[in-house]
Design a protein with these regions (language model features):
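Residue-level signal for short hydrophobic patches within transmembrane helices
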Residues: 12-31, 35, 57-64, 140, ...
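Short hydrophobic/small-residue motifs within alpha-helical transmembrane segments
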Residues: 142-146, 170
Length: 236
């Protein structure tokens, strides 16, 4: 026998609870690039243009991962509604393998073809060197960024929306601190300029990824991962 249908207000409330963390995550992810652009402003217009030109191709690549993550959130939420914890964990394992493989391919292609990608984005000769260097360093940290986003998407599916905010806020704070230290060479750190901004970004995303991984290694969490789990693909 089926239970009573939820009211319209409850439907909108549930939809909002699922949607706003995803929207907030997108804003925080884009904020990293904006912060980099602002903080290299002291280096001159060439540095600003070099960093700004990389944002569009980076988000084109991220859009593929985020499209996968929409499905991850939906399937994990469905498995939890069915009281199928193992099914939810299996979905996360499969999603992580796909996310890792896809991110590895995309980051490798992005690194190898950074120069033509920047040319297509409109980079002029005077900004080409800095934009290619920045984009290649960002691609080196693309895999942990995508792994973290996929885990966060699965956590949203089981109602744990706090992890997305925590990891992305941490990423932005670390990026901000190391931008200050590495762009202009403060407090004994080397002056790396545009490359320093890129290194700060991947450092922040790597720490965020580690926090996301830690969230699924806890014994008291709904989504738990272990090396001993079955990580193979199946038809189910």
């Amino acid at each position: 026998m089926r239970g009573p249908l939820p009211s319209t207000r409850e439907i909108y409330k549930n939809a909002l609870n699922v949607a706003w963390p995803s929207a907030a995550e997108s804003v925080l992810v884009s904020l990293v690039g904006s912060v980099d652009t602002m903080m290299v402003g002291g280096l001159g217009p060439v540095a600003i243009a070099a960093v700004g030109l990389t944002n569009q191709p980076k988000f084109v690549l991220l859009a593929l991962i985020m499209s996968l993550n929409v499905g991850v959130t939906t399937v994990v939420a469905r498995r939890k509604g069915q009281q199928n914890q193992e099914g939810a964990q299996k979905c996360l394992r499969v999603a992580l393998m796909i996310s890792f493989g896809l991110a590895l391919i995309l980051s490798t292609l992005g690194y190898l073809f950074a120069e033509p990608i920047m040319q297509f984005s409109g980079a002029q000769p005077d900004v080409m060197e800095d934009s290619v260097a920045y984009f290649r360093i960002i691609m080196m940290g693309f895999v942990p960024m995508c792994i973290g986003l996929t885990i966060n998407a699965a956590q949203r599916g089981v109602g744990n929306t706090r992890i997305s905010m925590t990891t992305n806020m941490t990423s932005n704070i670390i990026n901000l601190i190391f931008n200050y230290l590495l762009i202009h060479g403060k407090m004994g750190f080397p002056r790396l300029e545009v490359r320093g901004a890129a290194l700060a970004t991947i450092l922040g995303s790597t720490v965020a990824c580690l926090l996301s991984i830690r969230s699924v290694l806890k014994a008291d969490t709904y989504l738990k991962l272990s090396i001993k789990d079955h990580w193979g693909m199946d038809r189910e």
